[in-house]
UniProtKB/Swiss-Prot annotation:
Similarity comment text for this entry: Belongs to the TRAFAC class TrmE-Era-EngA-EngB-Septin-like GTPase superfamily. FeoB GTPase (TC 9.A.8) family.
Chain residues that bind GTP 2: 33-37
Source organism of the structure: Staphylococcus aureus (strain MRSA252)
Membrane topology note: Multi-pass membrane protein
Keywords associated with the record: Cell membrane, GTP-binding, Ion transport, Iron, Iron transport, Membrane, Nucleotide-binding, Transmembrane, Transmembrane helix, Transport
Lineage: Bacteria, Bacillati, Bacillota, Bacilli, Bacillales
Sequence positions that bind GTP 1: 8-15
Domain FeoB-type G: 1-161
Role noted for this protein: Probable transporter of a GTP-driven Fe(2+) uptake system.
PROSITE patterns per record: G_FEOB
Pfam family of the protein (one): FeoB_Cyto
Protein name: Fe(2+) transporter FeoB
InterPro entries registered for this protein in UniProt: Fe2_transport_prot-B, Fe2_transport_prot_B_C, FeoB_Cyto, FeoB_GTPase, G_FEOB_dom, Gate_dom, P-loop_NTPase
Length: 664
């Protein structure tokens, strides 16, 4: 099967095009850094495989995700490249395009966002550009799918009759050096003359990834030639001179191809940015927007729908299952397991799906509109005080959905110590798995202020992440503040299709988790409550679960929720935070009183909020721990990532409850 790779700058629509060409769905965000590892999909019509590579501005990598790109181009086999460029930022995008053309591999150029360019008054004669580059160009709007069908039909012809032809003349002295380098590379390696020229050019540009691919003897010879030509060129460095020549080539190339409107015209984005990124009112606006989202999720839409679903699962559905089991003569043990264990446990989590869907819809709306990238800029000013940059906030925002992709997104951070710091604080971001816990408790104890209480927990998670990052960056991970440079995407009206797919995929992941982790956890919790030292079908107060819960309940006694039931829910929370709610449903619903009544009797508003603080901050789930181990390659950092949140959660919850107890 033929392999084709898709490449481009960050946030030019690579993943949107990938989804359109393969019919699959990968996470899309209107900001840079969404793709951090290569993703493989099967092209429609069995054309071949398409590999979506992380966005990069240059083939000389400065972050882990960009290393994936260069490594793939050098070491993997592919039939051609699809280079997608932003038509509204064509000059900047051509920097990468020129480097890809220097590979002299079959290539198509996808001219994306032509709708945005047209709205800005930018006119592009792509036919003329195609003739100049001698490379096929396909205008597309990846977000809506316009033009992608034509591109798909042509991909199978990519490479047919291709003849390497692209070459930029870097001047007599540099060209002579490139020629000498090519001779060494072709003699010492298996690369042909076109690959050798590309390697020589990248080596002169100080691409360390290229140097790592060559043996030390070749590197020494090439370094000697690079040092020699550095003394001959009149520029500050060979790299600067080559970049100047390349920029001149691009300017000449686009001179009669692109027509821009008057520079005095102020775009809609610029006017809005002055308000939304204002250093004084930008943050209050963001908090107000988040409050509206939580108000909609927990008061106006989400909770009423969840109540209806809860009534159905706990009433009609459960009664129907019981009737069917009685009719079939199912043994009492299995009846109890299914109704009191599986349905009670899994159902108690599934009832929050409407709230999850509403929250994910609005988060996706903010992402696709381009607003979230502005928040990263806004937060950069604040995060500098805590030893981080705005680039760390992008993974943190992703963490509101799930901490695992949040940790993976840290690959886009160039500074290694900042990347590691971001990984260690990412679990403090309140992921969707914690939402059922919040929804349960705020619905019982804080009915009038549900959105404010949940918002306070999200803000608390961010504050704690900042405080911990301050400690880390001033001690074990001390580093200089990195400069945050980010391209602000154009504001756009989100695509209904994109919003639906994004919301559906996230909600589907939540439901899938209910059918695996939560199902398994519910069965185990119920069995532990059913079995004890004296046999089976024992009173829950004589069960193994009671024994385990009593031990942990004693440990958290000073935190305000020191019952054995609460203690028993904390242990399976390591598996997945949603299991906390399913465990409560099984434990608290085992008696005659309902779940809500028992929780009201065992918690107060103060201890309920203390419990939510502890759930927010204590150990990450097992999937997050695995992701931390994978990204840090260290058991030491992984152990720290498990231990310090537990200590932090205990200390902060203790202080909150004990101080609060003095006033309540």
């Amino acid at each position: 099967m033929e392999n084709y790779c898709i490449l481009g700058n960050p946030n030019v629509g690579k993943t949107s095009l990938f989804n359109a060409l393969t019919g699959s769905y990968e996470y899309i965000g209107n900001w840079s850094g969404v793709t951090v590892e290569k993703k493989v999909g099967k092209l429609k019509e069995n054309v071949g495989q398409l590999i979506d590579l992380p966005g990069t501005y240059d083939l000389s990598p400065i972050s882990k995700d960009e290393t994936v790109v260069t490594d793939y181009l050098l070491n993997d086999s592919f039939s051609g490249i699809i280079n997608i460029v932003d038509a509204s930022q064509l000059k900047r995008n051509m920097q990468l395009t020129v480097q890809l053309l220097e590979l002299n591999q079959p290539i198509y150029i996808g001219l994306n966002m032509i709708d945005v360019a047209t709205k800005r008054g930018i006119k592009i004669d792509y036919h003329k550009l195609m003739k100049k580059l001698k490379t096929p160009i396909f205008p597309v709007v990846a977000r809506t799918g316009k033009g992608t069908k034509h591109l798909l039909g042509e991909i199978k012809h990519l490479g047919e009759g291709y003849q390497p032809h692209f070459k930029i003349n870097y001047g007599e002295k540099i060209e002579e050096t490139i020629k000498n380098m090519c001779q060494i590379i072709m003699t010492e390696t298996s690369h042909d003359k076109y690959q050798a020229r590309f390697i020589a050019i990248q080596f002169l540009l100080n691409n360390m990834q290229i140097a790592n691919e060559l043996n030390s003897e070749v590197v020494n010879k090439l370094s000697s030639l690079r040092d020699q030509v550095a003394e001959q060129v009149e520029a500050v460095s060979v790299r600067r001179e080559m970049e100047r020549i390349r920029n001149h080539y691009i300017e000449t190339l686009l001179q009669d191809v692109v027509t821009y409107p008057d520079e005095d015209k102020q775009y809609f984005s610029s006017r809005i940015d002055k308000i939304l990124t204002h250093k004084y009112i930008g943050m209050p606006i963001f908090l107000a927007i988040m409050w509206l989202i939580f108000q909609t999720t927990f008061t106006w839409i989400g909770t009423p729908l969840s109540d209806q679903l809860d009534a159905f699962i706990g009433g009609t559905f459960t009664d129907s299952v019981k009737t069917i089991m009685n009719y079939l003569g199912v043994i009492p043990f299995l009846q109890d397991l299914i109704t009191d264990g599986i349905i009670a446990g899994v159902g108690s989590v599934l009832v929050f799906v409407p709230q999850i869907v509403v929250l994910f819809f609005f988060i996706s709306l903010l992402e696709d509109s381009g607003y979230m990238a502005r928040i990263a800029v806004l937060m950069d000013r604040i995060m500098e005080s805590f030893g981080l940059s705005g680039k760390s906030f992008i993974p943190m925002i992703i963490g509101f959905g799930c901490n695992v992709p949040s940790i993976m997104a840290a690959r886009s951070i160039e500074n290694e110590k900042e990347r590691l710091t971001t990984i260690l604080i990412a679990p403090f971001m309140s992921c969707s798995a914690r939402l059922p816990v919040y929804a349960l408790f705020v619905g019982i104890f804080f009915k009038e202020n549900q959105s404010l209480v949940v918002l306070s927990l999200y803000v608390l998670g961010i504050i704690m992440a900042f405080l911990v990052s301050t400690v880390l960056t001033k001690t074990v991970l001390k580093n200089d503040n990195a400069i945050f440079i980010v391209e602000l995407p154009t504001y756009r009206v989100p695509s209904i299709k994109t919003l639906w797919r994004s919301t559906w995929e996230k909600a589907k992941g939540f439901v899938r988790k209910a059918g695996t982790f939560i199902f398994g956890g519910s069965v185990v919790i119920w069995l532990l409550s059913y079995v004890g030292p004296h046999g089976i079908n024992v009173n829950i107060n004589q069960s193994f679960l009671h024994m385990v819960g009593s031990f942990f309940g004693m440990l958290v006694q000073p935190l305000g929720f020191g019952t054995w039931q609460a203690g028993a829910t904390l242990v399976p929370g390591f598996l997945a935070k949603e299991v906390i709610v399913s465990s409560m449903a099984i434990i608290y619903s085992s008696g005659d009183a309902g779940l809500v009544n028992v929780i009201q009797n065992q918690f107060t508003p103060l201890s309920a909020y203390a419990f939510m603080i502890f759930i927010l901050l204590y150990i990450p789930c097992v999937s997050t721990v695995a992701a931390i181990r994978k990204e840090t390659y260290s058991w030491k950092w992984t152990a720290l990532a498990v231990a310090y949140p537990l200590v932090t959660a205990y200390v902060l919850t203790f202080i909150f409850y004990q101080v609060g107890h003095l006033f309540v």
